[in-house]
Amino acid sequence: MPDTISFARGAPSPDLIPVEAVRKATAKALEDDWKTALSYGVGIGHPGLCAWIADRHGLPAADQVMVTNGSLEAGGMLFSHLLGPGDRVVVEQPSYDRTLLMLKEIGVEFVPIPLESDGIDVDALEAALAEGPIKLAHIIPNFHNPAGCTLSEAKRHRLVAPAGEHDFVIFEDDPYRELPFGEVPPPPTMLSMDRADKVIHASSFSKTVSPGVRVGYL
């Protein structure tokens, strides 16, 4: 139907896609080194892109970044590596349906934690930790899909601390970080707060460049 805004998919409006910038970048890549641009790359991703992402997140080395086929694949790769049947996994309630389907296929035990206006209920998460070990917590920190909330900075610190103490991984699933309304950016990433190597961050260029490029990272 004309003039209908569809909420069925989390896709940017076509008029927001930077078509001219993508066209120029593609032309430059082909002009600078078309053989490399059109050949097989390395499995971890383009070295220049990995270095750019590492620098953006304050990481010491580009080899701490893996380029993926969107952020959903990043999550799938992480889950298949870390999780097995029966592992207790914290999920926000509500959460992104496709992520829940991937976790269900693995056979994890869901530990649903309700969302508040400033993100996940950390008190409820701490209560869940008292009931048994958690293997992973899946968190969408910014402009949550589908709830729309953003995790407060105070709660980010409160989440990072017990991850180290109780030895569980926080999967910071953050494809919407670059989409704030207004001039105020979202709070710092949990990755930047992590001192115990318990936060794994994923994001995507599907919302800012184009869904069709299918480029994300872990």
Regions found by a protein language model. Name each.
Residues 1-44, 168:
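N-terminal "arm"/small-domain region of PLP-dependent enzymes with the aminotransferase-like
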Residues 191-218:
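Active-site PLP attachment segment
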Residues 17-21, 182-184, 212-214:
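Short aromatic-enriched loop/helix-cap "lid" or pocket-rim segments at secondary-structure transitions
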Residues 9-11, 71, 149, 213, ...:
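Gly/Ser/Thr-rich helix-start
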Residues 10-13, 141-145, 207:
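Short glycine-rich anion-binding loops that position phosphate/pyrophosphate groups of nucleotides
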Residues 36-167, 178-196, 200:
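Conserved core of the PLP fold type I
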